[in-house]
Amino acid sequence: MAKLLMIQGTSSNCGKSLIVTALCRITKNRGIKVAPFKAQNMSLQSFITEDGGEIGLAQAIQAEAAGVVPNVHMNPVLLKPSGQQGIQIVVHGKLYKTLNSIDFYSEKKKLWENVTDSLNYLLKEHDFLIIEGAGSPAEINLLEKDIVNMAVAEYLKAPVILVGDIDRGGVFASLYGTVKLLEKYDSLFKGFIINKFRGHVDILSPGIKKLEELINKPCLGVVPYLDETGISDEDGVSMRLINFFAQKVNAPVKIVVLRLRYISNFNDFEPLRFEPDTELMYSLKKEDLLSADIIIIPGSKKTFEDLKLLRELKIDQTLRELAKNGVEIIGICGGFQMLGEKLIDPYMVESSLREFDGIGLLPVETLFYPEKITTQVEGCLCSEPSIKITGYEIHKGITYGHLGLFKITRTSMNQTLFDGIVCGNVWGTYIHGIFESDSLRRWLINRHRVKKGLNPIDYSFSWKKLKESFIDTLANTIEKNLDINRVWEIAGL
């Protein structure tokens, strides 16, 4: 029988995902066959598995930390907010329904069956399962509808460790309140972790001792505030979308990613901000756009709405002017669609509007269909075939025009085709994750170095190795600051 451990939190963004990631790596390093699991995830940050299924990005990163291939059972239910249209429900990697928040709860029975099916699958395949909760388990108005927190813990009789975020303040009250509101599950709570602490741990000692007495649970560690982990945080979009110019003021190549209202998969650009000769920021301010060498329109969960926003702010005009002046404009997925001439939506997949003018910088039109394309891809840059790329597609539209920027194979569909288009200094593609390609990243940056009279740099760091080092560093920090032997004892290891 597989061993179990569940990490829950007193709130969203308290550090559950990163702690699970660290524990997966620590366990892997002990030679244990471990896997992550999160029954239900709400996020616009998703990942496509080898078989074309869509799961939360956090579970894909946790699987990487565990040394296993991500699959749809690690996150059987993925919720993707779609604004006024409601919530897209992705079940076992495929779009199931789009519902409003009220109707969503009527699906509990069906979704719970999917959750337990996935649990049973993973328990057979692995020796240890580290389970992540969602938000707070103490949302007492939703307890009867729960399929992700105490419902999972009770179903498995899994020991639960509760994480509290001291950086927000009120950590003792939130830990105490969570346990006391869930007294019927008291036997499942085995201890707590205080996360994001700034200062000397001795200051906390009186409070920790008092809380241990009040709830009769031990403190298993105090984790310091980590300014930079290098690991994408699904809840951290507001924290991530900050101005990085100040951090590398002398870097020659300035990149601005448009800070869209419905931005998705912002992790696409993480590799760019670690390059030594780039400055990366997210902005919609005209003064920032005017100083940029490269402007990227990212993916969007609501392409029409974000395109309307750009029009209201007259950013579409600014982009056209900058393109004439030689600034490189790039569109990824929804951003690619926006750069075209028209977006046509006969089935009203994206909007009540059936047709919308694009920015007009690429000679393409996009037609939206209800079916979603989800697949991993691999290929090369057509103009320089030695530049290899990998990534994934996740979109509903099909874009028509003289495509030929990349030659790709959709691996889960066994289909070879051309993707993307380039028109002067403007280009677009459907492929997420292309900047994880070390050679493509350096190709992009070097062209701007040469333009500025600088020599190109032959070397580019390995993003794959850097990610591994980020996970190792996180794991070392967590292991150092937890009573890890007691954690393993709780898990029965």
From Swiss-Prot:
SUPFAM superfamilies, alphabetized: Class I glutamine amidotransferase-like, P-loop containing nucleoside triphosphate hydrolases
A molecular function GO annotation: catalytic activity
Record has ATP-binding as a keyword: no
Entry annotation: catalytic residues: C333, H432
Domain GATase cobBQ-type: 252-440
Homology family: Belongs to the CobB/CobQ family. CobQ subfamily.
Record-given protein name: Cobyric acid synthase
Organism: Thermodesulfovibrio yellowstonii (strain ATCC 51303 / DSM 11347 / YP87)
Gene responsible for this protein: cobQ
